[in-house]
Amino acid sequence: MLRDGQGKLLTQTRHIIDNDSTQVKLLPFNFIKRGSDNSRSINPVLMLSPNERIYGCGESFTSLNKVGQKVQISVVDPQGPETDGMYKPVPFYFSNRGYGIFMHTSAPTTADFGASYIGAQRLFMGDETMDFFIFFGEPKDVLNAYTDVTGKSPMLPLWTFGTWMSRITYFSQEEGLDIARKLRANKIPPDVIHFDTGWFGVDWQCDYEFAKDRFKDPVAMLKSMKKDGFHTCLWQLPYFTPKNRYFRELVDGGMAVHNGNGTLSYEDA
């Protein structure tokens, strides 16, 4: 059981005797064992209280309150904000009841916050051991304690918290400058113009150079945007095909990511 300093019950592990439905049998806090290879993974099951709200687990575009959701805490390309996948998952969450949990694992985890059973939060972890940090207090205290463990980021410049103007994608110097002019003319106050994949010579294939046929003078463009009060962000992708001029340097220098069997990791190269 987790209780606060005044003895209030915050949450507790669920056991087989806690089943409160005659029809639906919820597995208690357990290990899941696979017959194929005898491996195990842990499945912590905790109480989820009425009106409890859960926040965290990283960047996602679903509802801020995760109760009622099944959150996949693993890196995927969500292909847009309409899905529940995450570029930046974080195995940490906190509750409005005054506690937070950091799952100290890099293994894929599925957090079922009352999605399949409203009275339980179920953590399906791809790990044989459970290493949890549990924090107590108001949200600001929980976050402060969590970052005491994982590290605190420095305060970013004020402009980074402003509006970033982007799309997939601005393909030319003139298009970027035109967007900047229209934003100022219409008194829309963004701080950043972001060029997605379209600034490369070949879309999606990052060679860290502006396409010469579409960006005639990128230095002048950057100076113009800076004069108008814009910061410029350039999208980058650490993905190199054999035709990329940096490919051989990457492979020969031992900088490429390899699969477990030693072969190069690739998609459609």
Labelled PLM ranges:
Residues 48, 154-269:
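Aromatic-lined carbohydrate-binding/catalytic grooves of carbohydrate-active enzymes
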Residues 1-160, 167-169, 173-174, 180-185:
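Catalytic and substrate-binding clefts that recognize carbohydrates or anionic sugar/phosphate headgroups
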